[in-house]
């Protein structure tokens, strides 16, 4: 496709002479076929089109000129007429015929381009087709193309020779470097072997000369090893003892610190004494000592009034009672205390109010139980009435049932 486009662009819009156009196409195909590198570069395509255009113009002018000479000396034609006669016959046509031919060629130019891209040159002279290979076989363009091919081949051969020379030189350099490395390695190995041999000889001679000295050294080394092992064992035992003693000391210190803290708390409590709130919340009876604090504010001063003795006897009875449930044997003493409180309402007004408040719900409970209890007499009367009614109903039924 690329070559066909180049041929069309090079040979289009030229003077409408079929012979010149056919030569232009033929020469462009020969040039492209002879140059293998054609089409790789856009610059080459442009130059080829420009050259083909110039050649087509030159051919057209040559065929239009009256005194023309043959274009190629070695041209051959199969027909009886020579190329010059055919061209002269085509050139000596009348101007009217030339105009007609020009108009026809312009109209059918594109069709001829598409038909004659591969094999035919396109022009018809006297009804005979001139083949592209027969119009010009040994032209100057072919010679130039061959020279270009030769020059490119020479360049390729020169480059290949240079590359082969470079490769040979690099291979030689690598070989020499490898040989030098091998020589250096062998020399180093030989030196090491000689040094090892000398050391072995010196060691053998020293052993032969001083066997007793070597035995002494061995015994000394063994003693030193034993000493080091014993020292290590002693150090481990000491470290274990230290750790045990440290742990014991830490435990003792912790215990002593706890005891000291408790003692300090007790001393502070004794010095500070109980606060008013603590005294109020504490009970009158101390279970540790088994004594009763009659001055305790929780008793409300009842132990020091006119009924103090009755209160003390009742309270101590409740505290020291061993009966279960506790306080059953102290009920009578408690009743005597309440009777004493009623004699002195001025001193025990609050206590009497509390006892009255406690007795009211008890009285209400008793009343409710009495009211809720069924009346035995009324129940008996109701039962008798029901029995009489049932007897009355049965008697008429029995009378009706008799015949």
UniProtKB/Swiss-Prot annotation:
Disulphide bridges: 296-298, 307-340, 317-330
Cofactor note: Cu(2+) or Zn(2+).
Localization per Swiss-Prot or TrEMBL: Mitochondrion inner membrane
Compositional bias (Basic and acidic residues): 75-84, 101-118, 147-168, 206-230, 262-271, 382-403
Location of the motif Cx9C motif 1: 307-317
Cofactor(s) the protein needs: Cu(2+); Zn(2+)
Motif Cx9C motif 2: chain residues: 330-340
Keyword Translocase appears in the UniProt entry: no
Disordered: region residues: 75-292, 351-403
Mitochondrial intermembrane topological intervals: 67-403
Transit peptide: 1-31
Transmembrane segments: 47-66
Coiled coil ranges: none
Substitution effect: residue 296 to S: Loss of function
Membrane-side (Mitochondrial matrix) residue stretches: 33-46
Effect of residue 307 to S: Loss of function
Effect in UniProt of substituting residue 298 to S: Loss of function
PANTHER family from the UniProt entry: COILED-COIL-HELIX-COILED-COIL-HELIX DOMAIN CONTAINING 4
Record remark: domains: The CHCH domain contains a conserved twin Cys-X(9)-Cys motif which is required for import and stability of MIA40 in mitochondria.
Protein name, per record: Mitochondrial intermembrane space import and assembly protein 40
Organism: Saccharomyces cerevisiae (strain ATCC 204508 / S288c) (Baker's yeast)
């Amino acid at each position: 496709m690329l070559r066909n486009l180049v041929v069309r662009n090079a040979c289009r819009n030229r003077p409408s002479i079929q012979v010149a156009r056919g030569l232009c196409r033929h020469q462009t195909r020969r040039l492209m076929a002879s140059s293998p590198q054609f089409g790789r570069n856009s610059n080459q395509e442009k130059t080829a089109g420009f050259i083909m255009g110039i050649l087509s113009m030159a051919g057209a002018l040559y065929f239009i000129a009256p005194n023309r000479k043959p274009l190629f000396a070695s041209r051959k034609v199969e027909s009886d007429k020579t190329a010059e006669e055919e061209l002269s016959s085509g050139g000596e046509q009348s101007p009217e015929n030339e105009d007609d031919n020009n108009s026809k060629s312009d109209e059918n130019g594109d069709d001829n381009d598409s038909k004659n891209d591969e094999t035919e040159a396109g022009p018809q002279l006297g009804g005979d087709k001139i083949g592209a290979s027969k119009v010009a076989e040994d032209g100057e363009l072919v010679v130039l193309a061959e020279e270009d091919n030769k020059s490119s081949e020479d360049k390729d051969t020169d480059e290949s020779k240079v590359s082969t020379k470079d490769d040979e030189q690099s291979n030689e350099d690598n070989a020499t470097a490898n040989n030098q490395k091998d020589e250096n390695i062998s020399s180093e190995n030989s030196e090491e072997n000689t040094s090892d041999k000398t050391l072995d000889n010196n060691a053998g001679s020293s052993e032969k000369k001083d066997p007793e000295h070597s035995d002494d050294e061995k015994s000394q080394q063994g003693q030193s090893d034993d000493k080091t092992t014993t020292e290590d064992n002693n150090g481990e035992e000491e470290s274990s003892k230290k750790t045990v003693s440290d742990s014991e000391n830490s435990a003792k210190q912790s215990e002593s610190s706890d005891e000291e803290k408790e003692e300090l708390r007790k001393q502070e409590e004794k010095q500070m004494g109980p606060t008013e709130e603590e005294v109020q919340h504490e009970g009158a009876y101390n279970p540790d000592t088994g004594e009763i604090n009659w001055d305790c504010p929780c008793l409300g001063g009842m132990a020091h009034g006119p009924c103090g003795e009755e209160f003390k006897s009742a309270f101590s009875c409740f505290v020291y009672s061993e009966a279960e449930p506790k306080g059953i044997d102290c009920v009578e003493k408690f009743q005597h205390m309440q009777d004493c409180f009623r004699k002195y309402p001025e001193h025990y007004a609050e206590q009497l109010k509390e006892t009255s408040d406690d007795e009211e719900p008890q009285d209400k409970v008793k009343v409710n139980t009495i009211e809720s209890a069924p009346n035995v007499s009324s129940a008996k009367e109701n039962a008798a009435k029901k029995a009489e009614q049932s007897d009355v109903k049965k008697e008429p039924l029995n009378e009706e049932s008799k015949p």
